[in-house]
From Swiss-Prot:
This is Electrogenic sodium bicarbonate cotransporter 4. Residues 437-464 have a biased composition (Gly residues). GO terms for cellular component: apical plasma membrane; basolateral plasma membrane. The gene is Slc4a5. Residues 1-515, 580-600, 653-730, 790-819, 887-922, 967-987, 1030-1116 are cytoplasmic. It catalyses: 2 hydrogencarbonate(out) + Na(+)(out) = 2 hydrogencarbonate(in) + Na(+)(in); 3 hydrogencarbonate(out) + Na(+)(out) = 3 hydrogencarbonate(in) + Na(+)(in). Disulfide bonds: none annotated. It comes from Mus musculus. Gene3D superfamilies: Helical hairpin bin, Mannitol-specific EII, Chain A. Residues 537-558, 622-631, 752-768, 841-865, 944-945 are extracellular. The keyword Membrane applies.
Length: 1116
């Protein structure tokens, strides 16, 4: 049954004239809403569409026509029979939005900048003044109009959203308006209002005059201004006062000009001139171009302008929503030079300014909502916009008025939820929305978005609550798929990496790369010196600091040039050092040549690595989950922290603090130079340096018998053969304390400067620059402090001549001639241990670097990485250089130093992590600098070793950030009420989390014990043991718990996915059957056959039917 609104006497509604009905009011309206079946429903398509239900609205009021809430052109169904209460988790608004938004692969819409201007009255003068703005969060002009508020989350009243919904239902909606100037837009809107009977023709000029008033924007001025700025402001003030004196005549001239233009024609061209004091131009003015706020607005953004105000000549609101075909520059309407695409106008009678302002804030907040902005761009009619508001209401959260002060501004969250999660409810295979009808009689059945509503049998949810909020599955990239072909994985890695090879070089030309190179370079040379010295001690200088420098430079640069993942940094590791020591001791005890024996072990290990590459053995890495990754990376981080502190404590042994110093016995502390017992009359060269106060004029050449030994310095005394005598001769200034200051100061300052990026001081670019170069600034500062004090702190010593550390060895190791023949095949067994160590170290580090949290867009290359590690192992074995493998901590530090974030972010929005600057330049430059460090020895000798130990400590601590294991360890020391809101704490019982963490701690302790003893030779085997332990955890923990605190293993992952697909298919088939079958009415539902109640306008009975767009209904 379709009702003609005009015949029924329906008038348009004033959305702001909402009044609470009093009990004593005569003839109250009765609104009865219930769903009516539409059997003309089309069958669900591939997207799972279900047609919306319909709602019939009654009003019984004698002598007074019905006020319509529905839009025009809406049909109703009057068929009787049983009502179809389909159990659905989606609201009709969500169904309609799915049809509006279409496919997800379409190009994204521009970001919207929304500005709200309110009409200000000053006597007879009026102007539009900017009162708030939005990009993501709301910023208000503070009281007094001198500054912007902090960005905050918009808090809207539910009533304002309902009023906005009614505004769009009753007002003028112009979609795809072909206009390019504000006067033309205003004329089109007014003409449409007059045609629809919403505005009297005699008010045309007055409304147009108000809407074309001058726009004054909020500008921010710095507190400290230069003299030039003060001079400009004074001259500007003089010109402003001159203009203000002639404001009255200008007003009349503008009004007269308006009458003349409108009397001639209503068709304006795009080059029409402004008719107001605003002098609206098509091009941005100087103030707009100089506005620094433009930096916060993303590129290619568009604007939506909201104009709200009250006037005394209107008796009902003037409401319009406009979308332009093409965005247009409206001159001074917008604060920044951004073209306008949307315009919302609300002018109403006087006395309701606060209500108008709240409606304006509501539409402005909706326009910056990710989902509603997409709806606004793609809406085809008024009903689509209403559906967008209804979807917003489906997800809205209401705060009780007695428990929350609306004046409190909510700080923007650190992480804003994506609109993709809300879009996912448009599919039948997804759980329901936040809000919806309960039971079976509403438009959307039970959709508990938090996991509760989707699981009930009566709610008709698709799946359980666990499925609704399960974390992302353990994703295995295509790089780890077993091909079954000889070198199949390696060939695919090469094909994947070749297209990216040119960009791997030009992507590295960025300022951020400089700080990354310096940071990693200092870490690498410190590592090379440390492990070089330890190798020299362990192998009797067959391998030392010089071999460590050259090997690091050669292996690292070749790997970064040709590997699959150039962000990985190669270095010597602790297990390799232990293996080298055991191998040297075994060779020495059995009379074998160490270098030749080592060469054959390296060759066999290289061949074994190539066999693993040829058979795609790297695919077993997919069984390495978070459990193994975190255990390995945490162990390496602890090793770095432990070694840094151990080195620092060692300084206290060489330069102890003088704890025996007693101030009372200061007179007994002395040290003097004593001549040798037998002093010959031997003369010495007079060119030898003496103390400044030594008298050398009496003896030339120098005669030791005539020398005053008590005046010589310590260095002179020892050089002339004298000896030091006294209780204070062994006193050393507090070098240990100074070393600790340098060590801890470097670490703490680096940590502070890294966090400075997120502080509130200085502009964003300055903070970013300081954070990127934090390591460099810290090293330079504390090197300067050390130089100022002039204490003999231990310095960095780099070899200055390129030659082997041991004089009796060369740069090439002969494979034959020094060991028995059986050594060559027998070396396969120790080579197998080395291969396991290399494979696990390399591939676990690669998994950590390539994890999805780093958002790497270029393909990984596990097989290609292992191939080059094997080749480099053979090359280093022939040249007698150390073996190299991926260094976990330094690689993580390399990733962190190259992270990219959004350059422009909305006020209040945290910079979004974009990914990592993937390139080969930084790695190659680091290792080239390491190689030429031999020639930089005169400069590097000024760097104190405690400063480099501080860099080591920072690397170890920084690599612990973001590790879930470390966060779970902290929970042992926190009461439950103070624990952070981690996602796994919401879904897994705390005792199960503690049990899982204890298992990891025990495994980590066992690995640490093995690493610290001679049993470290089996360390790589124990890393494989972590994978076995993880598989055994499936017997203790459920797959649900493991999905949150770890990852599901691949075969379990596949089973879970197949089970979910099967369950969703069954639910989808059941939903289709229920749509085709009529169901019985629940006992709580009253059925009213509409065909039996005819519309009778004479008796005041009006039946108005409209399409049901949501579970929300708002009646005035």
């Amino acid at each position: 049954m379709k009702v003609d609104e005009e015949k029924a006497g329906v008038k348009k509604l004033d959305p702001t004239s909402y009044k609470r009905r009093q009990p004593e009011q005569d003839f109250p309206s009765i609104h009865i809403g219930f769903p009516v079946p539409s059997y003309s429903q089309r069958k669900s398509d591939s997207k799972g569409h279900l047609s919306g239900l319909q709602k019939v609205q009654w009003s019984l009021k004698p002598g007074k026509p019905q006020q319509e809430l529905a839009g025009p052109g809406i049909r109703a169904s009057s068929q009787g029979g049983a009502v179809d209460f389909t159990k659905r988790t989606r609201s009709p608004a969500a169904e309609q939005l799915q049809d509006i938004l279409g496919e997800e692969d379409e190009a994204p819409n521009p970001t919207l900048f929304t500005e709200m201007d309110t009409l200000q009255h000053d006597g007879d003068q009026m102007e539009w003044k900017e009162s708030a703005r939005w990009i993501k969060f709301e910023e208000k002009v503070e009281e007094g109009g001198e500054r912007w508020s902090k960005p905050h989350v918009s808090t809207l009243s539910l009533h304002s959203l309902f009023e906005l919904r009614t505004c769009l239902q009753t007002g003028t909606v112009l979609l795809d308006l072909d206009s390019c100037s504000l006067p033309q837009i205003i004329d089109d809107v007014i003409e449409k209002q007059i045609e629809d009977g919403l505005l009297r023709p005699e008010l045309r000029e007055r409304v147009s005059y108000v809407l074309l008033r001058k726009h004054r924007h909020q500008t921010k001025k710095p507190i400290h201004r230069s003299l030039a700025d003060i001079g400009k402001s004074v001259s500007t003030t003089n010109r402003s006062s001159a203009r203000s004196s002639s404001a009255g005549p200008t007003l009349h001239r503008s009004t007269e000009d308006l009458r003349i233009r409108q009397s001639t024609s209503y068709g304006h061209l795009c080059h029409a001139q402004s008719r107001s004091m605003n002098d609206i131009s098509h091009t941005p003015n100087t103030d707009q171009r100089k506005n620094k706020f433009m930096k916060k607005i993303p590129k290619d953004s568009e604007a939506s302008n909201v104009l709200v105000g009250e006037v005394d000549f209107l008796d009902q609101p003037f409401i319009a929503f406009v979308r332009l075909v093409q965005s247009a520059m409206l001159g001074g309407v917008t604060e920044v030079p951004v073209p306008t695409r949307f315009l919302f106008i609300l002018l109403g009678p006087s006395g309701r300014a606060k209500s108008y302002n709240e409606i304006g804030r509501a539409i402005a907040t909706l326009m910056v909502d990710d989902l509603f902005s997409d709806v606004a761009y793609k809406a085809r009619n008024r009903e689509d916009l209403i559906a967008g508001i209804d979807e917003f209401l489906d997800e809205v959260i209401v705060l009780p008025p007695g428990e929350w002060d609306p004046n409190i501004r909510i700080e923007p969250p650190k992480k804003v939820p994506s609109a993709d999660k809300r879009k996912s409810v448009f599919s039948l295979a997804e759980p329901g929305q936040m809000n919806g009808s309960v039971g079976g009689g509403g438009a959307s059945a039970g959709g508990g978005g938090s996991g509760g509503g989707a699981g009930g049998s009566g709610a008709g949810g698709v799946g359980s609550g666990d499925e609704a909020e399960m974390p992302a599955m353990h994703e295995i990239g295509e790089e780890l798929i077993w091909t079954g072909r000889f070198f199949g994985g390696l060939c695919l890695d090469v094909k994947r990496k070749l297209p990216w090879f040119p960009s791997d070089f030009y992507d590295g030309f960025h300022l951020q790369s400089i700080s990354a190179v310096l940071f990693i370079y200092l870490g690498c040379i410190t590592n090379a010196i440390t492990f070089g010295g330890l190798l020299g001690d362990a192998t009797d200088n067959y391998q030392g600091v010089m071999e460590s420098f050259l090997g690091t430079a050669m292996a690292g640069s070749l790997f970064c040039l040709f590997s699959g993942q150039p962000l990985i940094i190669l270095s010597s590791t602790g297990p390799i050092l232990i293996f080298e020591k055991l191998l040297f001791d075994f060779s020495k005890a059995n009379g074998l040549d160490y270098m030749e024996f080592r060469l054959w072990i390296g060759l066999h290990s290289a061949i074994q690595c190539l066999i693993l590459v040829a058979t795609d053995a790297s695919f077993i890495i997919k069984y390495i989950t978070r459990f193994t990754e975190e255990g390995f990376s945490t162990l390496i981080s602890f090793i770095f922290i432990y070694d840094a502190i151990k080195k620092m404590i060692g300084a206290f042994k060489y330069y102890p603090i003088n704890t025996d110093f007693k101030p009372d016995f200061i007179t007994t502390y002395k040290c003097e130079c004593v001549a040798p017992d037998t002093v010959n009359t031997t003369t010495v060269n007079a060119s030898a340096p003496l103390a400044p106060n030594t008298n050398t004029s009496l003896y030339t050449p120098l005669n030791l018998t005539a020398l005053d030994w008590s005046l010589l310095s310590k260095k002179e005394c020892l050089s002339y053969g004298g000896r030091l005598l006294g209780s204070s001769c062994q006193f050393v200034p507090d070098l240990a304390l100074m070393s600790f200051i340098l060590f801890f100061g470097t670490y703490s300052m680096t940590l502070t400067l890294k966090k400075f990026k997120f502080s509130r001081y200085f502009p964003t670019k300055v903070r970013t620059l300081v954070a990127d170069f934090s390591i460099v600034f810290s090293i330079l500062l504390f090197c300067g402090i050390d130089a100022c004090f002039g204490l003999q702190t231990p310095k960095l010593h780099v070899p200055s001549v390129i030659k082997p550390t041991r004089p009796d060895r060369g740069w090439f190791v002969a494979p034959f001639g020094k060991n028995p023949w059986w050594v060559y095949p027998a070396s396969i067994l120790p080579a197998l241990l080395v291969t396991i160590l290399i494979f696990m170290d390399q591939q676990i580090t690669a998994v950590i670097v390539n994890r999805k949290e780093n958002k790497l867009r270029k393909a990984a290359g596990y097989h290609l990485d292992l191939f080059w590690v094997g080749i480099l192992m053979a090359l280093c074995s022939f040249t007698g250089l150390p073996w190299y493998v991926a260094a976990t901590v330094i690689s993580i530090a390399h990733i962190d130093s190259l992270k990219m974030e959004t350059e422009t972010s909305a006020p209040g929005e945290q910079p979004q992590f974009l990914g990592v600057r993937e390139q080969r330049v930084t790695g190659v430059m680091v290792f080239i600098l390491t190689g030429i460090s031999v020639f930089l020895a005169p400069i590097l000798k000024y760097i104190p070793m405690p400063v480099l130990y501080g860099v080591f400590l920072y690397m170890g601590v920084a690599s612990l950030n973001g590790i879930q294991f470390w966060e779970r360890c902290k929970l042992f020391l926190m009461p439950a009420k103070h624990q952070p809101d981690h996602a796994f704490l919401r879904h897994v019982p705390l005792r199960r989390i503690h049990l899982f963490t204890l298992v990891q701690i025990l495994c980590l302790a066992l690995l640490w014990i093995l690493k610290s003893t001679m049993a470290a030779i089996i360390f790589p085997v124990m890393i494989l043991g972590l994978i076995i332990v993880r598989r055994l955890l499936d017997l203790i923990f459920s797959q649900h718990d493991l999905a949150w605190i770890d990852n599901i293993l691949p075969e379990k992952d596949k089973k879970e996915t197949d089970k979910k697909k099967k369950r969703r298919k069954e639910v989808h088939e059941t939903a289709e059957k229920e749509v085709a079958m009529p169901q019985f009415l629940p006992p709580s539902v009253v059925k009213i056959p509409m065909e039996g109640i005819p519309s009778d306008p004479q008796n005041g009975i009006h039946c108005v039917a409209r399409k049901r767009s949501s579970s929300w209904s708002y009646s005035l």
